[in-house]
């Protein structure tokens, strides 16, 4: 297994001193991005004696910027969407043309205009082979989930275009960067190959992960590798690829323990998973280990000053990410108001 970083570490890397050195300096992570969606089944429609659910969703994508230790909203999308079965386009039009026309028609409604509300799009879902009601609903929700991911990619592309991201201003995206290829949505955002250069200064940080899928630096599955990770240490960077799912995009993946094991429920709590997409020049050499140490020490210093009461994930929270999540949630329309539209 080829190492995912320039230093060929064989064991955990202690970041305690590096993290202390970074305290008081301006952190290199300046932007924090979080996306979420709320979905609701709002109706049923019938075609050819079959009943299909109508799914409505609110998608929220927020990015906050930290300047001089203060967090401020940088960008926000709130997008209202509907998901309808493909069979609702019975006239043989192309789906994108038909559903774009329906969206336009919907937005002309006096009631929506009065409220100053617009739907961003209507997303067609293909009914699954197993047409049990729950499964149908899942197909509609999956389309809204895909749309949320596309909106996240769009926001990253806008930040890059505006020249906001560089070696002193990384973006932390909440969650994984392992985006599967999309069959629908914007052509230029569908595959990672097309957009990977937008991710030069982006890291993905996951608060939870499947311990079964953990690879050590030799490429072997090894959950104990993380369970035994000492406080403020990171694992060597493993190289991760999945050609059938992610194409020829390679990742550096590593884990950092930000909380002492003795205070957490399980040995995996208090550990975060970090991903970075390898740029072309890093595919042979791996990602610069100094860059990995700097990012990791910065993440250790981001851990929360408090725990959040009932949130079981408190041990894995990073404070600016928590603030960004809270900001996104605060921008949602209330469930009553949203459902009242239908």
PLM features: residue spans?
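Conserved catalytic motifs of the protein kinase core domain
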Residues: 28
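Active-site cofactor/substrate anionic-group-binding motifs, chiefly glycine-
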Residues: 55-68
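Covalent nucleotidyltransferase core used to form phosphodiester bonds in nucleic acids
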Residues: 45-55
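Short hydrophobic beta-strand that contains or immediately precedes a catalytic carboxylate
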Residues: 31-33
């Amino acid at each position: 297994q080829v190492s995912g970083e320039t230093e060929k570490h064989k064991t955990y890397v202690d970041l305690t001193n590096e993290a202390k050195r970074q305290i008081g300096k301006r952190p290199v992570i300046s932007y924090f991005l979080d996306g979420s969606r709320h979905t609701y089944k709002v109706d049923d429609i019938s075609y050819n004696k079959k009943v299909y659910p109508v799914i409505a969703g609110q998608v929220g994508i927020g990015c906050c910027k930290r300047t001089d230790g203060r967090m401020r909203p940088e960008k926000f999308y709130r997008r209202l969407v509907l998901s309808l079965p493909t069979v609702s386009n019975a006239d043989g039009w192309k789906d994108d043309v038909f559903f774009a026309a329906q969206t336009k028609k919907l937005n002309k409604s006096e009631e929506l205009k009065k409220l100053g509300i617009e739907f961003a799009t209507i997303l067609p879902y293909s009914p699954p082979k197993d047409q049990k009601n729950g499964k149908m609903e899942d197909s509609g929700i999956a389309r809204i989930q895909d749309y949320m991911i596309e909106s996240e990619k769009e926001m990253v592309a806008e930040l890059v275009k505006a020249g906001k991201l560089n070696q002193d201003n990384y973006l932390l995206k909440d969650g994984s960067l392992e985006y599967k290829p999309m069959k629908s949505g914007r052509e230029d955002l569908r595959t990672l190959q097309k957009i990977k250069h937008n991710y030069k200064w982006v890291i993905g940080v996951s608060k939870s992960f499947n311990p079964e899928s953990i690879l050590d630096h030799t490429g072997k599955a090894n959950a104990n590798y993380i369970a035994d990770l000492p406080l403020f240490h990171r694992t060597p960077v493993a190289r991760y690829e999945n050609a059938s799912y992610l194409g020829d995009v390679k990742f550096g993946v590593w884990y950092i323990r930000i909380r002492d094991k003795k205070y957490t429920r399980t040995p995996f709590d208090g550990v975060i998973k970090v991903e970075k997409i390898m740029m072309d020049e890093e595919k042979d050499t791996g990602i610069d280990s100094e860059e990995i140490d700097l990012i990791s020490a910065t993440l250790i210093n981001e851990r929360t000053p408090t725990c959040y009461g009932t949130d079981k994930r408190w041990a894995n929270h990073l404070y600016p990410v928590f603030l960004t999540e809270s900001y996104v949630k605060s921008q949602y329309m209330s469930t009553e108001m949203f459902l009242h539209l239908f």
